[in-house]
Amino acid sequence: MRLFDIDLINRYNRSGPRYTSYPSANNFSEFSLEEYEQQTDLSSRRRSSISLYCHIPFCNTVCYYCGCNKVVTKDKAKAKPYLDALYKEIDMQSLLFDKTQIVKQMHFGGGTPTFLSGEQIIQLSNKLQQAFNFELNGEYSIEIDPRGIDKNLIESLAIARFNRISIGVQDFDFEVQKAVNRVQSFNQTKKVIDIARVNDFSSVSIDLIYGLPRQSKDTFIKTLEKVNDLRPERISLFNYAHLPERFKPQRRIALEELPNPAEKLRIFQYSLEYLIAQGYIYIGMDHFALPDDPLAIAQIEGNLHRNFQGYSTHSECDIVGLGVSSIGHVADSYSQNEKDLKRYYQALESGHLPISKGLILNTDDKIRRALIMELICHFEVNIQRLEKRFSIRFISYFEECLLELLQMQSDGLIKLNNESLKVMERGKLLVRNVCMVFDTYLKFTEESFSKTI
């Protein structure tokens, strides 16, 4: 059965969440520090494992496609007050968790974490290790920009206990790079990866984006071939969402230079077929991995999870978000820090955590979240297990979803019976659409998301 079915894609391609959480972050609302502390207390009593996410917002230059929370500056001195504030937040957060809780994952994202010097990264990592209880052989990853990195900085990352790197490439074509203000050569990227492998980094991940200005199937073929030469363990292939009304840098992208919808689909189709032909496993949505990568193994073993950093091998971890705009998932809650750097500083100077909004999951949220995560990660839901876990009857609980599900079954996207809901091969690229059937929040927020393909 074909994975790529153009007729189905054209019929179902609409805006929808990436489901790095459920409910999605744009449903967060007022959330008190007292509520957060109740959730950290619950996490401690459960002895939940911890994943630390640390946001470094600074970038030397602006990439026009980017929708991340960032501060564009070449002034390296701005890192010092930010780190001082971050250290305060780390101290405050660490007091809310039990010392027996183990940190199994750590991720530095941005912005550009390698805006910091090697010494600053080591100091920040040491601070986290002093504040929390780290697993000896955990997964510790960092996003890097090859344009401003050298051998010494890679060695500093290794000293700081990082063992995985994520590199934003997006496209190796020079014309595309100029159009998005991110010129980065293949040789720069290869050099950094080679140094990382010499320093025993166990995994390299590369991010690509399809749908960028001046991009075509023919140009992107060459990018894919170069990426395959680098042979990263993981590849993320994101759909560019042009939302200039929300993301100011995107206003510098000429609308007429974007590939038309048909060409964009051709780029995606070829990319999908090429990567699978080169031995990569399609994990789901926007991720590919080599067969021996922990992501691929976790999917086979039924242990795959999805969070704000994408797919993950640690489903049991609570996420502690640190830094401006970072998002956490602790016990039965989601929370997000202040997005504005000034307000982030003010909160910490006043002696309280900079949490600005969040959400406590109700019973319905938990049921739908569990179902959506199973679909996103494993393309199948064991209905009887879900019913037993939450004391529900699937057919009656999701009665309002049945008409859409039956239509999807008629179209060959899914197979539904008393035992399971399974996403079929031709429906895997449209798994977000299947999840959207169960999303009770979607009718209020659909216009703010990217297309599902």
Feature annotation, model-predicted:
Residues 1-50:
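Flexible, acidic/Gly-rich N-terminal and inter-domain linker regions that tether
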Residues 42, 49, 73-94, 102-395, ...:
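C-terminal scaffold of the Radical SAM
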Residues 54-70:
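Local cysteine-cluster metal-coordination motifs and their immediate loop/turn environment
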Residues 386, 403-411:
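Basic amphipathic alpha-helical segments that dock to polyanions
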Residues 398-399:
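Amphipathic alpha-helical substructures
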Residues 409-419:
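A short, conserved structural fragment
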Residues 420-424:
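Minor-groove-contacting beta-hairpin "wing" of winged helix-turn-helix DNA-binding domains
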Residues 428-453:
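Short, amphipathic alpha-helical interaction segments positioned at domain boundaries
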